[in-house]
Every structure is written in C-alpha cells, then in structure tokens.
Design a protein with these regions (language model features):
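Intrinsically disordered, low-complexity terminal regions
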Residues: 1-376
Length: 376
C-alpha cells in the first residue's frame, strides 16, 4: 500500500472527527521519517500495521484535550496511550498513588485522564529550530504502583524506555530505540525500522518483535516469541522460553547463548547463526548462505539443520534424531554420542564414524563435504 492510499483509508475511518487531520498529520510524518531513513514507501507503510488495527487503537482518543496536567490522582488508570514524535519517553513507577508527567520543555503535549485511559498526545507546537540543533526533548511519566492493563505507544524518532509492569504493550516507532524491563503478563508487540529493541524481565504472554536495520537483544523468561529482522542482528542470552521461539532474519546475524525452549526454529538468508549451550525439545535451523556455528546444542527429540552454501560446524551437539543437509556447504565437527549414520552426496567427500544402535543421523550434500566424529 502506498502512503496516500494508507492516509485515505485512515481518513475514511476517522470521518467526522474534529481531530482527524491532526492524526493524519502524525502518521504522514511517521511514513516520511521512515522513508528518509532509507525505507521503501510500501515498507514504511507496512511497518505501521493494518489501518483497522490503528483505528481500533486510536479512535477512542481522537478528541484531544488542550489542558496539560502535570500531577493528578492516578487511581483508576487501566490504559496508557502515548502519541509522540521526537521526544524521548521514559515510563516508570512512582512512589505515590498519582501519575506525574515531567517535560524537559513545557507546552508540547496535551494530557487527559478519562474513563481509565491516560492519553498523552504530542500537539502541533513546533520546537525552535536552529543550525546544528536537533529538535528533541525528554518526557518522563511516573505511574502508580501495581500492574496497569495496557500501554500503547506510537513515536517517530524519540527513544522509548519502559521500567514499569504492564499486562500488554504495543510500541510502533521509526528510528526509535525501545527498551523494556519489567513484568508483562500479556502480549508484547514492538515494531521499529532502524531502532534497536532491548528486553529484559518476565514476559508471560506472546512476544512479537519486528525490526528492519535495528538490532534485538533479549534476556529473561518468556512464554513464546516471534522475532523478525531484515539487516538487524538478533541476540538472545540467559533466557528460558516456556513454549516456542521463532527467529527469522535476512542478512542479520543470530546469536543465542544459554537458552532453553520447547521448540526453537531459526531461519536466515545470508546472516550467520551462532548457538552455544542450547537445550530444546525440537530444534530446526535453516540458512541459505549464512554459516552455522553450534556448540553444546542439545535437542531432546529432533535436531535438524539445512543450508545451501553455508557451512555447518558442530561441537558437542546431540539429539536422538539428527539431520544435516547442504548443497555446497561443508558439515564438520563432533557429536556427543554415536548414531546410526546414513549419508548421500553427488560429489562431496563423506567421512563418518562407525555406527551404533542408538539414535539416528542423516547427512545429505550435493558438492559439500562432511566430516563428523563422536566425542565419547
């Protein structure tokens, strides 16, 4: 979808609202900022999400109040909505039963608390622009203690840091870095273009992350996750995943260290994949030209790797059922225990240890070589 098509559809959904033009201006600027960062027009629009989802999130907050509230009783807050452009935003826990908003520059935000929804909206006031001066600022929101039901943030270039417990979190940004540290019992969804995403804490609901050139770093306890990046790297360390973790990149590298998961699925086009000290019920890895370096990777059921031209290197890996397939990539390294080995190749050299009655390991190449040994 093109920019104008997106804006026309959004405008139709906002028909009759006195603040529709302000909302359209906001999303128009988001698309243009992403295109300035090098994204194609269609990709910049797609990053914002479906028009229906945007309308569902913002239609209740279209009437923008004009009175700024700095310190107000915070009881009854169930949802926080922030619509920002260039200010860095920090959301954290206060010490009283109030919410407090601190701005580095006053007068740039309209605030209201109505029917349990706290809304902070960047107004049309423009910062003074000078040569070599970046029009930005800081916005800090202090919230009452306890978990709040939902946080919904849309921003352009300002960074976003959340040090507060919520049930659900939805963040959409362009060049914004996003950092979450806390406990989140529901779904967490974050989309950025060039911004980095850093997560640490307890994420008890489904997690969805999508970046273009931005990197992703995760640490903590997770229910399940879907991580996608184009050229950005993805790193997961010191993490436990109750159910499934799916990771997909184009040219970005993937690095997992000390991770336990029910099911682990990794896919990369040209990015390298590096795993160390991994345990999963099922492990499936796929790459075209990226190399795989796997150390102390264990699967309780199946361990499957497929590559086109990338090499597969194994050190102390094992599973009851293993399979490795390449076209021109080589397969080398060691397994912890012997297997019933089977192999096939067109022109590659295959060197495998003697077979044992326990476990299976299938090797397949076209021109790639295979050389495996057993450590026991």
């Amino acid at each position: 979808m093109k920019k104008q098509e997106f804006l026309d559809a959004l405008g139709a959904g906002l028909s009759g609202s006195s603040d529709a033009e302000e909302v359209l201006d906001f999303y128009r600027e988001m698309i243009e900022d992403r295109m300035e960062d090098g994204m194609e027009e269609g990709a910049a629009v797609e990053q914002l999400g479906a028009v229906e989802e945007i309308l569902a999130r913002c239609v209740q907050g279209l009437t923008v109040p004009k009175a700024v509230c700095e310190t107000t009783a915070g009881s009854g807050i169930s949802r926080v909505e922030i619509r920002e452009k260039e200010f860095d935003v920090t959301v954290c826990e206060g010490t009283e039963d109030t919410y407090r908003l601190e701005e580095s520059s006053e007068g740039y935000h309209d605030v209201t608390l109505e029917n349990g929804v706290l809304r902070i909206v960047r107004n049309k006031r423009q910062p003074e622009r000078r040569l070599f001066f970046s029009a930005s600022g800081e916005l800090t929101l202090y919230l009452p203690k306890g978990q709040i039901q939902a946080l919904d943030v849309t921003t352009c270039s300002g960074d976003m840091e959340v040090r507060k417990d919520f049930e659900t979190v939805h963040v959409t940004g362009a060049s914004s870095d996003v950092t979450l540290s806390g406990s989140y019992s529901g779904k967490v969804a974050i989309q950025t273009a060039s911004g980095d995403v850093t997560l640490e804490g307890v994420f008890a609901g489904p997690l969805e992350l999508q970046t273009s050139s931005g990197s992703q770093e995760l640490k903590g306890r997770f229910h399940s996750g879907k991580l996608r990046a184009a050229s950005g790297d993805i790193e997961v360390a010191q993490a436990s995943v109750t159910e499934d973790l799916a990771v997909e990149t184009a040219s970005g590298d993937v690095e997992l260290t000390n991770v336990k998961a029910q099911e682990l699925r990794l896919r990369s086009a040209s990015g390298d994949i590096q795993l160390e000290r991994i345990c999963a019920e099922l492990l499936a890895i796929e790459s075209r030209s990226g190399d795989m370096e796997l150390q102390q990777v264990l699967a309780k059921e199946e361990f499957l790797c497929r590559s086109t031209s990338g090499d597969i290197s194994l050190t102390g890996c094992d599973a009851p059922k293993m399979g490795f397939a390449t076209v021109s990539g080589d397969i080398t390294g060691s397994l912890l225990h012997g297997k019933r080995f089977s192999s096939r190749t067109v022109s590659g050299d295959i060197h495998l240890p003697g077979g044992t009655p326990e476990g299976e390991c299938a090797i397949s190449t076209v021109s790639g070589d295979a050389n495996l040994r057993v450590e026991e």
